[in-house]
Amino acid sequence: MPRAPHSMPLLLLLLLSLPQAQTAFPQDPIPLLTSDLQGTSPSSWFRGLEDDAVAAELGLDFQRFLTLNRTLLVAARDHVFSFDLQAQEEGEGLVPNKFLTWRSQDMENCAVRGKLTDECYNYIRVLVPWDSQTLLACGTNSFSPVCRSYGITSLQQEGEELSGQARCPFDATQSTVAISAEGSLYSATAADFQASDAVVYRSLGPQPPLRSAKYDSKWLREPHFVYALEHGDHVYFFFREVSVEDARLGRVQFSRVARVCKRDMGGSPRALDRHWTSFLKLRLNCSVPGDSTFYFDVLQSLTGPVNLHGRSALFGVFTTQTNSIPGSAVCAFYLDDIERGFEGKFKEQRSLDGAWTPVSEDKVPSPRPGSCAGVGAAALFSSSQDLPDDVLLFIKAHPLLDPAVPPATHQPLLTLTSRALLTQVAVDGMAGPHRNTTVLFLGSNDGTVLKVLPPGGQSLGPEPIILEEIDAYSHARCSGKRSPRAARRIIGLELDTEGHRLFVAFPGCIVYLSLSRCARHGACQRSCLASLDPYCGWHRFRGCVNIRGPGGTDVDLTGNQESMEHGDCQDGATGSQSGPGDSAYVLLGPGPSPETPSSPSDAHPGPQSSTLGAHTQGVRRDLSPASASRSIPIPLLLACVAAAFALGASVSGLLVSCACRRANRRRSKDIETPGLPRPLSLRSLARLHGGGPEPPPPPKDGDAAQTPQLYTTFLPPPEGGSPPELACLPTPETTPELPVKHLRASGGPWEWNQNGNNASEGPGRPRGCSAAGGPAPRVLVRPPPPGCPGQEVEVTTLEELLRYLHGPQPPRKGSEPLASAPFTSRPPASEPGAALFVDSSPMPRDCVPPLRLDVPPDGKRAAPSGRPALSAPAPRLGVSGSRRLPFPTHRAPPGLLTRVPSGGPSRYSGGPGRHLLYLGRPDGHRGRSLKRVDVKSPLSPKPPLATPPQPAPHGSHFNF
């Protein structure tokens, strides 16, 4: 076996260096707590008015949240509901204190247009505070959008209706965002019934109305608007759209941020008249860095500015493409990074099928296109209408900038690839006792809410921590006529930090949750502090409490060591109490199940499960959240795997090499084993039974070279040797045998041996028949050389031969008589040629001619030293015409112990007076015992070349 390749160290080095060049993809964190809403009060849910038959059938049809002055406004189908958050804090259920009803008056015409009845209601899609006293609301109004003004406190209509075109979409499924800034309404939506004209529009103010370019894919291409923000001198719009710069990849969506100047007055009559002159857009890059960047391109939700590491940032939820591997990510973008991105280079497409490349600075006109007139680079121009035409034409053809806005931490704050897709985000940037902790609340499309600590904050590590996972969906209250998948999707999140609540909106209902569930820790201080919940703290007398609640300022945030070691951990739900020294593990559930003890030094629980009602149940694990979220470095893991593989391959290769060498050594020594019998000469058989002379001394080197082959075998030759030729003997199918007539045998003994493959036993007697009348293989024992007395004896088996060699044996009785009697009555053959050929009857199809065993005679030739090698080349056997053996003619050829066909002698049968040993072909060609044999001495038709042997006295031994 070849030795292990020398390239193994190189392969090991390659495997060790490969992980260094790759960045491991972040793993999904494991939630520390899993909860559901079992036992939650029914008053925490709101589905619509009790007397509303449509709401009872379809549900709420939630559209939008808006919080104003401790009042929560909920826009829905045909209604706007107002909830007093102060009353909710006092224990009242989720019941609106007032609401407005605005139904469509054009439902009949909507049905004529081919729309379904469920689509023809008035869905309130826009809800914007116009000032401190007025609320602007716009509805689809059966595909005829209309806007109205309402008083915030009274919810009574004020003024006349306005057209909602370009302010509100026609269809409830189309996206829209709107914001009021400096007395004007900035909206982004579809401006026509077919949603083919996407528009960013300004109206209802002292400034002239402006819009984006119509039907220009460079400006907007099938956008889905998500959020609008006023910041500084600009209004920002966040959306996703079908990419124009990567159109060769198909319909790939990119996340964008676009901005316009609030003081923009439009262009001149020659260019961009009544259109934006400051419209620019950038790509938002939310991706996992590495050799091949993995992008989360589809923006789903965005928050307002939140403090992150001392800087104002926006938090967004991004997902992968719809036809890609499902995955979600949370990325934060600093506002100053977004502003800096709008100072980047412009991008253009020089040819129709060409790539988008940055525009060189020498081709950009001055002042910089997109600048606000009167400030900055365009300070010399008091109005955008005074800008040069080349600037206006350039900004019309180059609204896209390069490069993309990077995330705040250069990578996502959280990535999820094995869970449901995230759809909504809400951020509390002032959590914790010192109001400096950021907590993310994330909604998904399967109805779960995640409470997450982002990395770098209180998580004390580079990995995020999922503090809690809550299943907030209730099929009984929120299903309606929608599909189960659509009904479970969370489409809105609203934080009430003062009331310590989170409002979760589904298409059919809304529900509110507490931001924390500190009471579940009971009287276990270790569990309370190890939960890492920024809303929970330990009170000396009240246990684990909410730090925002009554007495929340008098809490112990670090814990007393003596209290943690000797205090009791009590389950608040069941009242069971653990002994001293028990860990923070509390079995939250009914029943007297014992608690799981652990080391007192470990104060960090792991994943647990609980419910929000009286029936709580869960398990916590004995790991800190920080250490639990950290995994083994991927490079180290791959290096260990590669080293283990290389070590195992080396050891296994060494073992296999040793085993092969040992097998070759055994094969060369030809060890006799019961499972692998080999052909034996008669001399060997005689010696095994105590007969025959002692073996001659080992020959000299010169004589050993002349030693011929003693026998052949079916054993495979060693490497480098020629395979046995008996394995490929011709068959009757491949070598047809024709009847031979009037052939005459050669007079020489060696030619008689060459033609002996067609010899028969004699005239008038079927070949292959024994004395008993059945076919049996024959054994012909060659007489001893001249000068040695011998005796012709015929036996039926090798056993009889061995018994004869030991001495005189009594005659057989029964079914095994000696075969000497039939031979005495056999008439002698008149010609040698009559006994040299067999009939032309073919052999059986599945029969391979057996081997021939020749007994070497004693002579002056050197005896082989030891046993002959199994791989000695075998004599070539055939069924064709005669050939001379490659032996000298001046001496008799060496005897060979070879297997021959049972039907008669082979072409290498000896001449007259030469006795051969024929053995039947063993089953399977190897490894089987020899069959019954018959020892015969054929009558010599011609005098032999040497002196004929004389009969030996009975009982004497053969000399071989």
From Swiss-Prot:
GO terms for biological process: axon guidance; neural crest cell migration; positive regulation of cell migration; semaphorin-plexin signaling pathway. It holds the Pfam family Sema. Expressed in many regions of the developing nervous system, probably in neurons and their precursors, but also in nonneural tissue such as immature muscle and dermis. In adult, strong expression in the skeletal muscle and moderate expression in the brain, where cerebellum shows the highest expression. Also expressed in almost all areas of the CNS. The keyword Membrane applies. Residues 555-624, 685-725, 745-792, 806-960 are annotated as: Disordered. The keyword Acyltransferase does not apply. Residues 1-23 form the signal peptide. GO terms for cellular component: cytoplasm; plasma membrane. GO terms for molecular function: chemorepellent activity; semaphorin receptor binding. Disulfide bonds join C110-C120, C138-C147, C261-C372, C286-C331, C478-C509, C518-C536, C524-C569, C528-C544. It comes from the Eukaryota. The chain crosses the membrane at residues 636-656. Shows growth cone collapsing activity on dorsal root ganglion (DRG) neurons in vitro. May be a stop signal for the DRG neurons in their target areas, and possibly also for other neurons. May also be involved in the maintenance and remodeling of neuronal connections. This is Semaphorin-6C. The lineage of its organism: Eukaryota, Metazoa, Chordata, Craniata, Vertebrata.
